[in-house]
Amino acid sequence: MTECDWEKKSTSASNSDTEMKPELPPCVNPGNPVFSCMLDPKTLHTTTSLSKPKMIMYKTNSSNYGEFLPMPQFFPCYYTPREQVFSSHIRATGFYQNNTLNTAPDRTRTLDFPNFQHTL
């Protein structure tokens, strides 16, 4: 096969790819839409009259968290507090405090190993 024949084949293959490019159905795979969406990611932008276009492929990040206020429809209907025995005990007695001075030698494996004794 000569170079000329190879070039003809490669150009004809690229032409046929552009002419007969099948349209992929959007989001046909079940599962996470971020990983199963068949649309071109460059076209996946959303915008409203009050906002600039945003990429919808990666919808949430830490800066968007809490952007919208909670809607009353999703509030719990009733509040049932749980027992707070542990919190009440800590509130009454305080956290444990160890105010003693540690004078015991540290006997970890690193310090007991002869090769590491003088590396600190």
Swiss-Prot record:
InterPro entries (alphabetical): PIRC1/2
Tissue specificity: Expressed in trachea multiciliated cells.
Keywords, sorted A to Z: Cell projection, Cilium, Cytoplasm, Cytoskeleton, Flagellum
Any Pfam family: PIRC1_2
Membrane spanning residue stretches: none
Entry GO terms, CC: axonemal A tubule inner sheath; axonemal microtubule; sperm flagellum
Subcellular location: Cytoplasm, Cytoskeleton, Cilium axoneme; Cytoplasm, Cytoskeleton, Flagellum axoneme
Region feature Disordered, mapped onto this chain: 1-25
Disulfide bridges in this chain: none
Domain of life: Eukaryota
UniProt keyword Cytoplasm, yes or no: yes
PANTHER family in alphabetical order: PIERCE HOMOLOG (PTHR20899), PIERCER OF MICROTUBULE WALL 2 PROTEIN (PTHR20899:SF4)
Family: Belongs to the PIERCE2 family.
Protein name as catalogued: Piercer of microtubule wall 2 protein
Source organism (scientific name): Bos taurus (Bovine)
